[in-house]
Amino acid sequence: MPELPEVEAARRAIEENCLGKKIKRVIIADDNKVIHGISPSDFQTSILGKTIISARRKGKNLWLELDSPPFPSFQFGMAGAIYIKGVAVTKYKRSAVKDSEEWPSKYSKFFVELDDGLELSFTDKRRFAKVRLLANPTSVSPISELGPDALLEPMTVDEFAESLAKKKITIKPLLLDQGYISGIGNWIADEVLYQARIHPLQTASSLSKEQCEALHTSIKEVIEKAVEVDADSSQFPSYWIFHNREKKPGKAFVDGKKIDFITAGGRTTAYVPELQKLYGKDAEKAAKVRPAKRGVKPKEDDGDGEEDEQETEKEDESAKSKKGQKPRGGRGKKPASKTKTEESDDDGDDSEAEEEVVKPKGRGTKPAIKRKSEEKATSQAGKKPKGRKS
C-alpha cells in the first residue's frame, strides 16, 4: 500500500504542476465505496471553477487546498494513485495503471481538467481508498486522529525514547499505528527495524537507550532517502532489505544473510534473524510459542491482501462504526482466501486478480467457492515445501 514517500511524491507533483490553476472540468466516479459522504454531482459542483492553492499531506493522507472550502481529500488505501497527464509521478507498484490504457483510466475516481489543459486523476484499482470533500480536513477523522507526521513532525530522540518506554506492545505494530506516528507502513517498518537491528516482536518498552537512538535514526534516514528519490524504489540503497523482502522464503537474502518471514501485528514481516534477535522476556516467550507459530505461518498472506485492507480501515473515520458493517467484513474475507492461493506470486499480478473478485458485487459467490476449492488443493499440494520455511 502507498506509504508516506509515495504520497509525498504525489503531493510534490501537484505542487509543481497544478498550483494557481483553475478547475474547469470535473468527473467524479459513481462509486460510493470510494467517494465518501457526497454524491458525484454535488462533489463536482462544489469544486468546479475553484483554483488550486496548495497540496498538503499528513501521513498517508493528501488534500488539495482550493481558494475556498470545501477541499478534496484523499486516503490512498491499498492502491490509490495520483496521475497527471504527461507528468511522471511515482506510484506504488500495485497502483500502477498501464500507459497503454485509456485516459482517464477506467479506475479513475476523481478527475479534473485545469484551465491550461492539464489533467489530473486519482485512481484506485482495488477500491479501498476514500475520497472526501471536507471543509477542514485536519479537524475530522482520519487526519485529526493521526499522530505526528514521520517526516514533517519528528519527535526528538529523547521524546521518542520516553514514549517507547511507556509502550508495552511489540515494536512493529506500534510503528504501524498511525495514531502514534503517521506515514509508516509495512515496508518502512520492516526497513527501519532492520537498519536498527531490532526484532519486530521485541516489546517497545524493553528497548535500550541505544536501540531507541538507532531506531530514531533509521526512521529519519529511510524516510528522507525515500522522499529524496520521489519513492522510486530503483534508487533505494542496494543494502536495504526492501529489495528482497518479497522474494520467496528460502530465496530471500540481504548482504548474504537470510531473510525470514513472521507475522507481527497481523502483518507479514521480513527480518534477518542473524541480526535482529529477541532478548529478555520476549525471547523466553517466543521460545515457548514458536512451534505453534510455525504451524500457522504458511497461512499468512503476502502482505498485500486482507491485512492491507485492515490497515486502511484502521485509519478510516468509521473505525468504530465499521464493527457493525457485516457486508464489508464479508468482502474482506474473500480477498484473503484468494491471496492464500497466490501467496507465492509477489510480482504485483495479484492486484488485478483480486480486483476481479471485488468489482462484480453480484457475482461474488461462485468465484469465492471456486477459489476455496483451489486454495484447498494448493494447500495440500504445498504442505511439505512450506513446512521447510523455518
UniProtKB/Swiss-Prot annotation:
SUPFAM superfamilies named in the record: N-terminal domain of MutM-like DNA repair proteins (SSF81624), S13-like H2TH domain (SSF46946)
Disruption phenotype: No visible phenotype under normal growth conditions or UV-A irradiation stress.
Compositional bias annotation for Basic residues: 321-337, 360-370
Primary subcellular site in the record, as a coarse category: nucleus
SMART domains found in the cross-reference section: Fapy_DNA_glyco (SM00898), H2TH (SM01232)
Active site: P2, E3, K60
Subcellular location: Nucleus
Ranges where the record places region Disordered: 283-390
Pfam families assigned to the protein according to its UniProt record, in alphabetical order: Fapy_DNA_glyco, Fpg-like_C, H2TH
Signal is among the record's keywords: no
Keywords per UniProt: DNA damage, DNA repair, DNA-binding, Glycosidase, Hydrolase, Lyase, Multifunctional enzyme, Nucleus
Keyword Disulfide bond: no
Record-level GO BP terms: base-excision repair; DNA repair; response to oxidative stress
Assembly mode: Monomer.
Function summary: Involved in base excision repair of DNA damaged by oxidation or by mutagenic agents. Acts as a DNA glycosylase that recognizes and removes damaged bases. Can process efficiently 4,6-diamino-5-formamidopyrimidine (FapyA), 2,6-diamino-4- hydroxy-5-formamidopyrimidine (FapyG) and the further oxidation products of 8-oxoguanine (8-oxoG), such as guanidinohydantoin and spiroiminodihydantoin. Has marginal activity towards 8-oxoG. Has AP (apurinic/apyrimidinic) lyase activity.
UniProt protein name: Formamidopyrimidine-DNA glycosylase
Gene name tied to this protein: FPG1
